[in-house]
Every structure is written in C-alpha cells, then in structure tokens.
Amino acid sequence: MSIPTEPVGSLPRPAKLQAAYADYDAGKITKEQLTQAQDAACLDSIKRMEATGSPIVSDGEQRISSFATYPLTDTLAGTGLADHLAGDGQYFAIFTDGHNRQLPRLTGGPFRYKTYAAEFTEKAMKMATKPLKQAVIAPSMLALLYPLDGEVKGYSREQFLSDLCDECEKDIRGAFKAGTARVSIDFTEGRLACRC
C-alpha cells in the first residue's frame, strides 16, 4: 500500500554543487559550468524521488541558492544581482543557530524578476517521468525589498507593490504553462514571524 506524499521545500545541496556555487561567486567557473553542476544535482534529486514511488516530484530546488532570492540573483552571495537592487537590504531571518539571511535593497523601479520559476520547470520536465511540483516565493517576502523607512526616489511603495504582484502572478502562471502539476507558494517568513 502506498502513502500519497509530495515534496515540500528544498533538499540539501550536494557538496559538489555547494563548491560550484562558491567557485562561481569567486569567478573560478563560468555560469555554464554552474549550470552543469545544477543539472546533475537536479537529475539526482528527481530520480531519487521517483525511486521512492512518490506520485509527484521536484528538482529539490537545486537550481537556486536561496528560496527567497531566486528571481533576483544567481547566488546567495549576490552574484548576478538584478537591475535596481543593491546587496545591502534588510535581514529577514536570524536563525536560532546564529546564521542569517539578508535580502537585497530596492534602489529604483520598475521592479522586474530576473529569473522565473518556469525556467526551472522547463529544465526539470526533461528529466522527470512523474508530475512536477514547483515552489515560488511569496510576494510578502519580496515586499521586504522596499526600504522600511522612507521611499525610493521616483518609485512609490504602491507602484512597487503593484509591480511585485504582477511579477508574482507571472511567475505562478508561467510555471503552470511550463507544465508543472502543482505550484506551492513559499511563505517561510510566516513561520519565522511566529517565533516571537
């Protein structure tokens, strides 16, 4: 008897992929070489999930170094940051073990994603034999890009939020159009807010 399951969240990144991210940040490898390491990790994640008999699988989010910043930058360290962003934004998570995560800071508009989840779905579809699930970031997380104090010159908070909602919708619709069976919205900041 099988138990219906589906993946939630990312899988740990293999050591080889972690090294590739670090080497890419340091300029030691090209984007193409990083993509090769991501492809290998995604294929491994998909095949292992399929081997468990899971009726739906994911790529383990191996193509991203952070659930919160995949639309904005190539790596967690900020390599390949999108237009109108600076790397010195607010911290959104301080974990119990002391490590933290920082978002970029919006410097102007219009706000646009650099990368959409559909790109990950399209690549994973070529590797999977089972239906795919794709995670996307919640707009509430990316709303934290706008500085808490003051306004971005020439780009109101209201216009940013409108652009953000449009981009989030485009992200979700694009993932479905690319063939994903399910889209989940990653709302990790909600869990972190409950720790108080």
Task: List each model region and its residues.
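Domain-level signal for soluble alpha/beta catalytic cores
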Residues: 1-196
